[in-house]
């Protein structure tokens, strides 16, 4: 009997992670236009409205000015009613909590319209241990902001706008969401980013990364930066953009995720890119838990044969986003 107890103790000792009390998990997910169904006159949400609100001449004329045909058709014909919106919310929530049984400890979202829709998502996943959320309305006219949902208390948050160089100095873009969260009696910084899209000059993404570095240098707190960096494989291969961050940051997909193709698939170029990734600060007493960096892929958000993201289909009400979520576990030393 004593031998059994000893063996059980040794088995338990070696199975239970030594650092489990000092670990937390993160997920970053671009939710691809998560809008409510209400008209906000201060934001460009005209594509995401119920069809009955799209019948006026004013609305139709506004849509006809859109140059991209798919966006124009969406503006004219998409019926973004309450049921469709709820279907997207439920699909997102289902995939979030499918990670690690009850969802990540810290969830960073991009392309969230406002606090109203964020609160609705929070209410769906709150039973899984989430206690706080934050979204600060930015100047972005498109109405797609960054947000945090957390199982730990958010202490403070603010926005940092990015000043671009050269001919783009007057360009405005989405700011960096800076959030301080207390985890295991330690304060950590989280930077949620959504940098300029690929049709903008690459210098704007590099300026954004330099801004992120400057924020990190202003303090000594352990820090996590995550989100949609919008750096594609072509420009990264040429300019080593992610590699150049390693003086201050440990870049998730360069440190792990060995079998990951990317978080976004470009159909026209038939290529994968890590638009979305996770950084943690170097030499600040945090590191990645080995083998924890991955893409969170389910049968609902990725095709089984190709791994490509399944974007939300408002007719079938299936799918989640055109981006795959990246996840990691981080250890506080």
Regions found by a protein language model. Name each.
Residues 3-11:
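Sec-dependent signal peptide recognition
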Residues 18-124, 138, 300:
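N-terminal, active-site-proximal structural segment of metallo-dependent hydrolase catalytic domains
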Residues 25, 214-224, 230-333:
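Metal-dependent phosphoester-hydrolase catalytic domains
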Residues 106-108, 112-187:
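Structured beta-strand-rich core segments of catalytic domains in phosphoester-bond hydrolases
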Residues 31-35, 112-116, 138-142, 153-155, ...:
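Solvent-exposed loop/turn segments at secondary-structure junctions
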Residues 26-31, 75-81, 85, 92, ...:
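Active-site beta-strand/loop signature of hydrolases that rely on acidic residues for catalysis
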Residues 10-20:
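Hydrophobic h-region of N-terminal signal peptides that target proteins for export
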Residues 43-45, 107, 134-135, 165-166, ...:
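Extracytoplasmic, non-cytosolic globular domains
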């Amino acid at each position: 009997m004593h031998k059994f107890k000893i063996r059980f103790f040794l088995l338990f000792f070696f199975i239970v992670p030594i650092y489990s009390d000092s670990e937390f998990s993160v997920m970053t997910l671009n939710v691809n236009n998560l809008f409510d169904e209400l008209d906000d006159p201060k934001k460009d949400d005209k594509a995401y409205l119920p069809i009955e609100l799209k019948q006026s001449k004013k609305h139709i004329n506004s849509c006809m000015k859109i140059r991209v045909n798919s966006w124009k058709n969406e503006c004219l014909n998409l019926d973004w009613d309450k049921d469709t919106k709820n279907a997207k919310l439920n699909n997102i929530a289902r995939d979030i909590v499918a990670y690690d049984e009850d969802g990540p400890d810290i969830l960073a979202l991009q392309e969230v319209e406002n606090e109203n829709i964020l609160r609705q998502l929070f209410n769906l996943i709150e039973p899984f241990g989430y206690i706080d959320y934050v979204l600060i309305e930015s100047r972005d006219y498109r109405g797609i902001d960054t947000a945090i949902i957390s199982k730990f208390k958010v202490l403070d948050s603010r926005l940092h706008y990015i000043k671009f160089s050269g001919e783009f100095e007057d360009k405005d873009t989405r700011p960096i969401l800076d959030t301080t969260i207390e985890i295991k009696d330690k304060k950590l910084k989280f930077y949620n980013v959504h940098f300029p899209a690929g049709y903008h000059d690459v210098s704007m993404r590099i300026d954004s990364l330099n801004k992120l570095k400057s924020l990190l240098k202003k303090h000594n707190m352990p820090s996590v930066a995550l989100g949609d960096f919008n750096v594609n494989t072509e420009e990264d291969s040429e300019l080593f953009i992610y590699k150049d961050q390693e003086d201050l940051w440990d870049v998730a997909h360069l440190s792990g995720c060995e079998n990951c193709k990317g978080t976004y698939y470009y159909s026209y170029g038939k290529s994968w890119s890590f638009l979305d990734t996770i950084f943690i600060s170097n030499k600040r007493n945090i590191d990645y838990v080995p083998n924890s960096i991955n893409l969170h892929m389910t049968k609902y958000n990725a095709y089984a044969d190709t791994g490509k993201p399944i974007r939300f289909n408002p007719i079938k009400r299936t799918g989640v986003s055109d981006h795959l979520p990246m996840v990691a576990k981080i250890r506080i030393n």
